[in-house]
């Protein structure tokens, strides 16, 4: 395992984070460029996304916490100050969805998912440095979500609202999503930052929110027949249940496990551990003989998206290492190592740094999608490296 940890440290330092420092830092307008395309061309005037910047903040904060390299603290602080100065809505609370390349508000809607990632980033910076300002911002954003996005009547969190926290017609995270007022993805990326915030701010109100989120996963989001997580719902939690997303399933399996472990309630942990093993088994339907995991299965028409997306492989590796660590099942270690071998061979860009977005069904590299951008950040892959460095397995 020491060899695997050494490899992860090398990839993190010399393939991922150095790319973001050397290639993506925006020296002219501050923060980081909004886009580097699939051919490694920088687009200096691209809009800058909240999710990307919050994830950069998280990645460098976590890397500094674990590896203590001053250049990671410098990059984390750069991201912290940029998000604080340009994305935080000083008037209405929350954060903007995007700003232009000069840092002026562009899309001012309040996407709960993005606010969740800001909490993830600021709480990790506070965890890594003890910085009170970052912690205060994370707590304030938590209160914004609870005040405006939590639906006490139906339970759960509203997908998106206007800048002033009013209803909004188009709630979608991206063009690929259904326009549902409740999504699994947003709930996953609220429980994840709430768990991280709980590490540095253990309060009864936050614990109550986390326990409720675990109940939402087990009672509403989990498909009791297939053990996949269903993705899109309306206010009353009615959904089509027609998509199986293998990457989200395996990501949820280890994130929910992490939440139960951090909470420290043995009864909750026992319940969650029973469920997450079933979710992981369902996710394994996406595994392919080459060691990779495909993206999605649309049950209407029995169609598969066979792209091997970078983030799905990362979550597949962490999820199976988590299962091996806690349940000592050798086949899970084998799944993780085979997937890593696939990633090292196909997705890592050995020449230019960072990872390609995906390998297409025909085995070619997807260069249409970004190397760095609105949805491509040093989050999934740096987290995979850090999880494998930090864990005892």
What positions do the PLM features span?
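Glycan-recognition and catalytic cores of secretory/periplasmic carbohydrate-active enzymes
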Residues: 1-393
């Amino acid at each position: 395992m020491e060899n695997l940890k050494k490899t992860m440290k090398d990839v993190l330092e010399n393939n991922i984070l150095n790319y973001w420092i050397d290639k993506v830092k925006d020296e002219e307008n501050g923060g980081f460029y909004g886009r580097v395309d699939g051919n490694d061309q920088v687009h200096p005037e691209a809009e800058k996304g909240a999710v990307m910047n919050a994830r950069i903040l998280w990645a460098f904060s976590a890397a500094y916490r674990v590896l203590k390299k001053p250049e990671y603290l410098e990059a984390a602080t750069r991201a912290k100050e940029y998000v604080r100065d340009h994305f935080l809505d000083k008037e209405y609370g929350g954060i903007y969805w995007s700003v232009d390349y000069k840092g002026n508000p562009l899309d001012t809607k309040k996407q709960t998912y993005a606010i969740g990632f800001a909490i993830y980033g600021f709480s990790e910076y506070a965890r890594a440095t003890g910085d009170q300002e970052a912690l205060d911002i994370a707590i304030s954003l938590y209160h914004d979500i609870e005040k405006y996005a939590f639906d006490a009547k139906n339970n759960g969190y509203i997908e998106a609202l206007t800048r002033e926290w009013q209803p909004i017609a188009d709630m979608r995270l991206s063009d690929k999503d259904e326009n549902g007022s409740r999504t699994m993805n947003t709930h996953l990326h609220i429980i994840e930052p709430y768990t991280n915030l709980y590490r540095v701010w253990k309060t009864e109100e936050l614990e109550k929110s986390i326990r409720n989120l675990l109940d939402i996963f087990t009672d509403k989001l989990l498909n009791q027949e297939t053990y996949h997580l269903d993705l899109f719902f309306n206010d009353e939690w009615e959904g089509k249940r027609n998509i199986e997303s293998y990457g989200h399933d395996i990501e949820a399996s280890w994130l929910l496990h992490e939440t139960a472990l951090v909470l420290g309630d043995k009864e909750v942990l026992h319940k969650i551990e029973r469920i997450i093993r079933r979710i992981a088994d369902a996710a394994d339907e996406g595994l392919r003989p080459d060691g990779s995991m495909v993206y999605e299965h649309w049950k209407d028409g029995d169609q598969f998206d066979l792209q091997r997306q970078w983030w799905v492989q990362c979550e597949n590796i962490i999820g199976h290492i988590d299962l091996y660590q806690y349940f000592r099942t050798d086949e899970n270690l084998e799944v993780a190592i085979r997937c890593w071998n696939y990633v090292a061979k196909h997705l890592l860009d050995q020449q230019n740094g960072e990872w390609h977005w995906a390998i297409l069904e025909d085995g070619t590299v997807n260069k249409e999608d970004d190397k760095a951008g609105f949805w491509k950040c040093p989050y999934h892959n740096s987290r995979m490296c850090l999880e494998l460095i930090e864990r005892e397995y």
